[in-house]
From Swiss-Prot:
The gene is gltX. Zn(2+) binds at residues 96, 98, 118, 120. The lineage of its organism: Bacteria, Bacillati, Actinomycetota, Actinomycetes, Micromonosporales. Its main location: cytoplasm. It comes from Salinispora tropica (strain ATCC BAA-916 / DSM 44818 / JCM 13857 / NBRC 105044 / CNB-440). Its EC number is 6.1.1.17. GO terms for biological process: glutamyl-tRNA aminoacylation. This is Glutamate--tRNA ligase.
Length: 465
């Protein structure tokens, strides 16, 4: 098995799914997983994209050292050129000097494929001359596909396609085939967008006298509008999800469900079960919807299932400011690990991604809360000042400070003002945390402490008439 990404941008979630499918299939078959970086597009390749591929694979559990590679397609240039020469010398390819504009003028249509004009001109290599494969004039090419059966392609409808540029460098079709042959690849799992290339590549395998691999074209991943996921339009970079605080286990679980389902009525499935149950033959050939809302829900489930120590450890990059997004509004020396540990079980049940921990606990580590003015306007209605006066007095007089005491006290004060507990909580919550929603209020007050709570209530009271 091989996974062959191109280092031309951020690592795509669709690529991550293909990598996982190849990884599992290789383990199931007792085979070898090969990482081959297809780096022949010199104008677009960047070393940081290659490093990003390696880091992304490591994040989803495909660690360096557990596979062969990375190999680089550019290092096989000699083999590519040798294969092109072999095809030319064997009469299976010919040189052509037709430009796209000339072909269009000759055929009268920009959509018509190459017309075979140079097939019998016996041109040799030279400037402006590409090498084209001589497609058979009859018959059909049958692709054996574990997911799609045996798609059949009429050879007469396959144009004589370019396999090498005028400078001798191979195009993707030839380089890909030669690399797979060189590496002894027996199965190719890739996205269905490559299916139109497959009969051409299979013809190349046949022409080079080597048995082609077994193919498996997995369904394309689409957005909610059923459009193929686009780097320009959609959130597709695996790194972006990692940096936002998605868990690798949740991401892997979700990606494997794009086109496949485990046994039973379940979706949250342990990875060992996925590795055991996954079957390429069971993959649905229809397009797979990448539902970010569902992924968030998955991630929330995985977060809630973490042991509390792992949850606390997982939040550390955002709490300490070492994460790449969502920097905390407090200074490193203001962070109180003990206070966070006290509220961590409460926060764990309320966030869907780890980066959401910051706005849920920032009130604990700041001298004054960050007031959401919209929340303030909704909570501080007429009578809020009188309510806060009474709450301040009652909280000051409490003999002990804990969640039960503050709750019963606020409930009593609210009743005196004709308010149920939910209504009475709103101005207190905004005054203390800056927000209308968040962690359970009374447990938060206990951790915050009496003096800091009263200081914030008094500051809020000063803003009111």
């Amino acid at each position: 098995m091989r996974f062959a990404p191109s280092p031309t941008g951020m690592f795509h979630v669709g690529g991550a799914r293909s990598a996982l499918q190849n990884w599992i299939f290789a383990k199931q078959q007792g085979g070898v997983f090969v990482l081959r970086v297809e780096d022949t597009d010199a104008a677009r390749n960047k070393p940081e994209w290659t490093e990003g591929i390696l880091a992304a694979l490591e994040w989803i559990g495909i660690a360096r050292g557990s596979y062969e590679g990375p190999y680089f397609q550019s290092s096989y240039a000699t083999e590519h050129r040798a294969a092109a020469s072999r095809l030319h010398e064997g009469g299976r390819a010919y040189y052509c000097d037709c430009t796209r504009e000339v072909v269009q003028a000759r055929t009268g249509s920009p959509h018509t494929g190459y017309d075979g004009f140079c097939r019998d001109r016996n041109l040799g290599p030279g400037a402006g001359r590409a090498l084209r494969f001589r497609t058979p004039d009859e018959g059909a090419t049958v692709v054996v596909d574990l997911i799609r059966g045996e798609p059949t392609f009429d050879n007469r409808l396959i144009e004589d396609f370019v396999i090498a540029r005028s400078d001798g460098s191979p195009v993707f079709l030839l380089a890909n085939v030669v690399d797979d042959m060189t590496m002894g690849i027996t199965h190719v799992i890739r996205a269905e967008e490559h299916l139109p290339n497959t009969p051409k590549q299979q013809l190349l395998w046949d022409a080079l006298g080597v048995k082609p691999p077994v193919w498996a074209h997995v369904p394309v991943v689409v957005n909610e509008k059923r459009q193929k996921l686009s780097k320009r339009r959609d959130k597709v970079a695996l790194e972006a999800y990692r940096d936002e605080g998605y868990l690798a286990d949740a991401m892997c679980n979700y990606l494997m469900l794009l086109g496949w389902a485990p046994s039973g009525d379940r979706e949250i499935v342990p990875w060992p079960v996925i590795e055991e149950e996954f079957r390429l033959e069971e993959v649905n050939p229809s397009s797979a919807f990448f539902d970010e809302k569902k992924l968030r829900a998955f991630n929330g489930e995985y977060i809630r299932a973490l042991p509390i120590a792992e949850f606390i450890a997982g939040c550390q990059p955002w709490l300490t400011g070492t994460a790449t997004i969502a920097p905390p509004p407090w200074q490193p020396d203001e962070f109180d690990a003990e206070a966070f540990a006290a509220v961590a079980p409460l926060a764990q049940t309320r966030i869907a991604v780890l980066s959401e921990i910051v706005p849920n606990v920032d009130f604990l580590f700041l001298d004054s809360p960050l007031i959401d003015e919209g929340a303030w306007a909704k909570a501080m209605k007429e009578g809020a000042g009188d309510l806060l006066d009474a709450v301040i007095a009652a909280f000051t007089a409490l003999p002990s400070w804990d969640a039960d005491s503050t709750k019963s006290t606020l409930e009593a004060v609210g009743a005196e003002h004709g308010l149920k507990l939910g209504k009475a909580q709103a101005p207190v919550r905004v005054a203390v945390t800056g927000r209308r929603v968040g962690l359970p209020l009374f447990e938060s007050l206990e951790v915050l402490g009496r003096e800091r709570t009263l200081t914030r209530l008094r500051a809020a009271r000063l803003r009111l008439p």
